[in-house]
């Protein structure tokens, strides 16, 4: 199976030796900044977001899946349907220091109703997307408990389109939740 081979290769890759939450955050933000000069004024500047009050750009959104699914997305340029709404996206960054991977997996499972998030490894990889397509902001939010017991809330979005637009990928990799 090609996805398994790609996943094995992917697992051995380290993006600029990213080993901590802070390094991953800097890497994603710099990648996002690098993309801005590549677009013409008015082109891909914002995305359509369905919500009361009009359109706004939620910025970078994140998709959490396992490694083989990530490889299928990356090389097949398509989204997995991981919720009843289509592809479930969130503004929870993969470098959030004060949550554990198992808590993120629990939150995704609760938010999506998707049994695939039972095992934390099913959400160990991320795709950071500057989504030029249509996304809908969902009414529900993802509620997580931080490692120090505080309640954290993140917005949820969904896309029902199958294909990823060219240039939607900002970065992808292994999550660094709870790492200093």
Curated annotation (Swiss-Prot):
One of its GO terms (biological process) is cytokinin biosynthetic process. Its EC number is 3.2.1.-. Keywords: Cytokinin biosynthesis, Glycosidase, Hydrolase. It is an enzyme of class 3 (hydrolase). Transmembrane segments: none annotated. InterPro entries: Glyco_hydro_41, Glycosidase. GO terms for molecular function: beta-glucosidase activity. It comes from the Eukaryota. Residues 31-54 are annotated as: Disordered. Hydrolyzes cytokinin glucosides thus liberating free cytokinins. This is Cytokinin-beta-glucosidase. It comes from Nicotiana glauca (Glaucous tobacco).
């Amino acid at each position: 199976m090609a996805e398994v081979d790609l996943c094995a290769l992917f697992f051995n890759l380290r993006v600029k030796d990213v080993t901590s939450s802070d390094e991953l955050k800097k890497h994603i933000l710099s990648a996002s900044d690098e993309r801005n000069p590549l677009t013409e004024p008015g082109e891909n500047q914002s995305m359509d977001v369905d919500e009361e009050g009009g359109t706004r750009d939620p910025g970078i959104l994140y998709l959490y899946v396992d490694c083989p699914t990530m490889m299928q997305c990356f090389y097949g340029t398509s989204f997995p349907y991981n919720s009843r709404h289509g592809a479930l996206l969130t503004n929870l960054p993969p470098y959030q220091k004060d949550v554990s991977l198992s808590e993120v997996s629990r939150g995704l499972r609760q938010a999506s109703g998707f049994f695939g998030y039972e095992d934390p490894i099913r959400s160990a990889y991320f795709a950071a997307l500057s989504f030029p397509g249509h996304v809908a902001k969902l009414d529900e939010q993802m509620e997580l408990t931080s490692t120090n017991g505080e309640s954290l809330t993140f917005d949820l979005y969904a896309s029902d389109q199958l294909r990823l637009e060219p240039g939607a990928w900002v970065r992808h990799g292994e999550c660094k939740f709870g790492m200093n």
